[in-house]
Swiss-Prot record:
One of its GO terms (biological process) is cellular response to starvation. Inhibits RpoS proteolysis by regulating RssB activity, thereby increasing the stability of the sigma stress factor RpoS especially during phosphate starvation, but also in stationary phase and during nitrogen starvation. Its effect on RpoS stability is due to its interaction with RssB, which probably blocks the interaction of RssB with RpoS, and the consequent delivery of the RssB-RpoS complex to the ClpXP protein degradation pathway. Belongs to the IraP family. Disulfide bonds: none annotated. Keywords: Coiled coil, Cytoplasm, Stress response. It comes from Shigella dysenteriae serotype 1 (strain Sd197). Residues 2-36 form a coiled coil. This is Anti-adapter protein IraP. The keyword Coiled coil applies. Interacts with RssB. The gene is iraP. One of its GO terms (cellular component) is cytoplasm. It is found in: Cytoplasm.
Amino acid sequence: MKNLIAELLFKLALKEEESKELCAQVEALEIIVTAMLRNMAQNDQQRLIDQVEGALYEVKPDASIPDDDTELLRDYVKKLLKHPRQ
């Protein structure tokens, strides 16, 4: 029983580490996108936003992906492009 608990705690620690890495990657990408948008002319920003939104609209998600997940992704992309980090 102790071995099972120790193994579960070890697996949980690994998952937590993976989660931290993913969070760091997302944060880094947000910073990069924000910096790029802030250094672009307004018309270039709008052109990029239109292209990204167009690409998202054209992509047909896999049937195995829940609609809520797809909508969450679209909303987050829109938020990041229209209202970058402060």
